Amino acid sequence: MSGSKSPRGEFAGRKLRLKRKWCRWHDYNYVRRVLKLKEKYDPLEGAPMARGIVIEKVGLEAKQPNSAIRKCVRVQLIKNGRVVTAFCPGNHAINFIDEHDEVIIEGIGGPKGPRAKGDIPGVKYKVIMVGRNSLRELVRGRQEKIKR
């Protein structure tokens, strides 16, 4: 008779349930969800976006085989004081962002949380708004930055 690892029979329900409960801990996504690891270690604390203050502008070198200096900014988040690096997408987008500006950042990547963008090592966030203006609209010339 071929052996089955799962108990089979009329009264095997409890054993099956306990085994399923034990085996779930080998599932990466289950562990992350139950222990709330995203909220614990994510600088955005599980939120889709966050506000922050620009500390400095930085240029990061792209990984091989590309050769470029990607324009990024260091941002201190208002909600928890953590400092993250955010990418500035678009041609000359860095020129619309000054130090001490308030920006809104969001994660780069998909549903599994922020992932590093393309050839920029360690940058998991991008700037989407500067002050009350969309960075994309500023780059396209449809809006002008409000001077205070």
UniProtKB/Swiss-Prot annotation:
InterPro entries: NA-bd_OB-fold, Ribosomal_uS12, Ribosomal_uS12_arc, Ribosomal_uS12_euk/arc. Transmembrane segments: none annotated. One of its GO terms (cellular component) is cytosolic small ribosomal subunit. Keywords: Ribonucleoprotein, Ribosomal protein, RNA-binding, rRNA-binding. With S4 and S5 plays an important role in translational accuracy. Located at the interface of the 30S and 50S subunits. CDD domains: Ribosomal_S23. The lineage of its organism: Archaea, Methanobacteriati, Methanobacteriota, Methanomada group, Methanococci. Pfam families: Ribosom_S12_S23. One of its GO terms (molecular function) is rRNA binding. Part of the 30S ribosomal subunit. Coiled coil: none annotated. This is Small ribosomal subunit protein uS12. One of its GO terms (biological process) is translation. The gene is rps12. HAMAP family: Ribosomal_uS12_A. Belongs to the universal ribosomal protein uS12 family. PROSITE patterns: RIBOSOMAL_S12 (PS00055).
